[in-house]
């Protein structure tokens, strides 16, 4: 997997939220996913991720996901590890910037899905002034 393919995966994540397409979004997430680094040492699995995104999309809470500062860390035949800043923008315009390490794995011989995220740092960003609805 090249950096271009990682960028395509990140774009697909963003587009799935912009289209409010939960099925397309979850197709990018492995059923064995684990998210670490949350408050209280909680770990989020596939069901937790699905429940949260379903709630955010049904209630119109999450307006967009965007990514920047991509740094490739390791590439193997079936796995790639990278660091990225993810900006989650709410429908209210509030945003959270999350720095995280991400591991994608090729599943089913062709589909790249996230299998692990390690949240390193997050901060509340400035209120977005553009129309995000």
Predicted features along the sequence, with ranges:
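Short, low-complexity N-terminal intrinsically disordered segments enriched in polar/charged residues
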Residues: 1-32, 43, 47, 126, ...
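Hydrophobic alpha-helical core bundles mediating ligand binding, dimerization, or RNAP-core interactions
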Residues: 10-13, 17, 29, 33, ...
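A short gly/proline-enriched turn/hairpin at secondary-structure junctions
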Residues: 34-44, 58-60
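Surface-exposed, charged secondary-structure patches
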Residues: 50-97
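Short beta-strand edge/turn micro-motifs at domain boundaries
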Residues: 95-133
């Amino acid at each position: 997997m090249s950096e271009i393919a990682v960028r395509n995966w990140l774009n697909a994540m963003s587009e799935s939220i912009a289209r409010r397409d939960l099925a397309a979004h979850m197709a990018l997430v492995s059923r064995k996913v684990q998210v670490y680094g949350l408050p209280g040492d909680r770990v989020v699995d596939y069901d937790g991720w699905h429940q949260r995104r379903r709630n955010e999309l049904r209630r119109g809470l999450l307006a967009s996901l965007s990514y920047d500062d991509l740094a490739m860390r390791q590439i193997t035949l079936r796995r790639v590890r990278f660091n990225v800043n993810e900006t989650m923008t709410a429908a209210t315009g509030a945003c959270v910037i999350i720095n995280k390490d991400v591991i994608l794995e090729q599943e089913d011989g062709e589909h790249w899905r996230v299998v692990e995220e390690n949240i390193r740092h997050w901060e509340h960003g400035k209120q977005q002034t553009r129309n995000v609805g």
